[in-house]
Regions:
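Short, structured coil segments at secondary-structure junctions
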Residues: 5, 100-101, 238
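Conserved active-site segment immediately N-terminal to the catalytic lysine
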Residues: 67-116, 147-148, 181-185
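PLP-dependent aminotransferase class I/II
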Residues: 36-40, 45, 49-53, 91, ...
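PLP-dependent aminotransferase-like
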Residues: 1-84, 91
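Active-site acidic short loop of glycosyltransferases
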Residues: 31-35, 94, 101-102, 314
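A short alpha/beta connector and helix-capping loop motif
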Residues: 20-26, 94-104, 332, 337-340
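Structural detector of well-ordered beta-strand residues that form the stable sheet scaffold
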Residues: 10, 79-81, 105, 241-243, ...
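Short glycine- and hydrophobic/aromatic-rich loop-to-beta-strand nucleating segment
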Residues: 105-106, 115, 120-123, 199-201
């Protein structure tokens, strides 16, 4: 979407041996043209949005900010749009994912903890949300019809509908009202709306989600215990590291179980993946860094500029984690993983 609207993509390397971005490198990457920062909640662990907020509020960063529309002027600083695709149900510093940043986006894709088969949701938390929009707004070169008395919260909701429905100013139901056939298309925008059927699936999932999260917590605890036992017999240079999904200031959604075979190469990690597959266990890698992908190479990105991200990738394996698995399944995965890693 960043490229689609004509904005420039800027990537920041991760911290050394940590999946969160390097926040000081983030500060160095900010220019007068920076409009939004997108921290990612990898594996369901909330990023440190409070740290990002502290950075964008630094006097020297505020002095660089050049707003380009009324929302940016009202914010008075760079916006923070949190990628919460993995973190539905997670919290950090007592706040839930979706209420921490200015804007947050969730994915309800089929492989997510909470699914509607496809689609997602967006939340926002703006101090001026209930203020009235004073004048017509223009987005992506297209004037958005002005509604007298509309608040900014209402406007952002309407704008989201327009962006996701070919910029049509009426949905299918509205067009069926008596004498209300006519509609307008205000811009060459997108088709990515969630259907009512998908939303119905989500409403049912809400009832089950707390128990699903609880099971994920138990599965991760079993994985942790198994790997702790493995590390007790491995030498210090070849420990298996896993993400900390729960601590005094955070609790993740326990979406993915990432491990790193420290001191090992990508080839050795791939060997483990192949050995696990031979035993009927599907594993994954999260993720191959974006600068290694063709689309981003074409934008001029080079993985050599992101050594920490590459270091995280070069020996990472993701063990299976979903609520269709039984605790016996988790035990089977652990037993085989331990046996294979010991044999490296």
């Amino acid at each position: 979407m960043v490229a689609h609207v004509g904005a420039k993509i800027v990537m920041v390397d991760s911290q050394k041996d940590c999946v969160e971005m390097d926040y000081e490198k983030l500060a160095d990457a900010i220019t007068e043209r920076t409009k939004v920062i997108v921290p990612v909640d990898l594996a369901g662990i909330c990023a440190d949005v409070d740290k990002v907020r502290e950075i964008v509020n630094r006097p020297e960063i505020l002095a660089k900010f050049r707003p380009a529309n009324d929302i940016q002027r009202l914010m008075g600083r760079i916006a923070i749009s949190n990628d919460c695709a993995h973190s539905f149900g997670a919290l950090r510093h007592g706040k839930m994912a979706g209420e921490i940043a200015d804007f947050s986006s969730f994915s309800f894709h089929a492989v997510k903890n909470f699914t509607t088969a496809e689609g997602g949701a967006m939340t926002w938390n703006l101090a001026f949300g209930n203020a009235v929009v004073p004048r017509q707004q223009v987005y992506c070169g297209s004037p958005v019809p002005f509604i007298e008395g509309e608040t900014w919260n209402e406007f952002i909701y309407r704008l989201s509908q327009l962006f996701s429905l070919h910029a049509q100013n009426k949905d299918a139901l509205a067009k069926t009202k008596l004498g209300a056939w006519e509609y307008d298309i205000i811009g060459p925008w997108y088709k990515c709306n969630m259907t009512d059927i998908m939303a119905a699936l989500g409403l049912v999932q809400f009832e089950r989600y707390p128990s699903m999260l609880e099971k994920r917590h138990k599965m991760v605890a079993m994985y942790n215990a198994g790997i702790d036992s493995l590390n007790a017999v491995l030498d210090a240079d070849h420990q298996v590291k896993y993400l900390n999904h729960k601590g005094p200031d955070h609790c993740s959604s326990h979406h993915l179980y990432l491990v790193r075979l420290t001191g090992r190469s990508r080839e050795e990690a791939n060997h483990v993946i192949e050995q696990m597959a031979e035993r009927g266990i599907a594993t994954n890698v999260h993720y191959k860094p974006l600068p290694m992908m063709t689309a981003y190479k074409a934008h001029g990105f080079d993985i050599a500029d992101f050594p920490n991200a590459y270091h995280l990738f070069e020996n990472e394996i993701t063990l299976p984690l979903n609520t269709k698995m039984s605790m016996e399944d988790v035990e089977y995965v652990v037993e085989n993983f331990v046996e294979i890693v010991k044999g490296l």
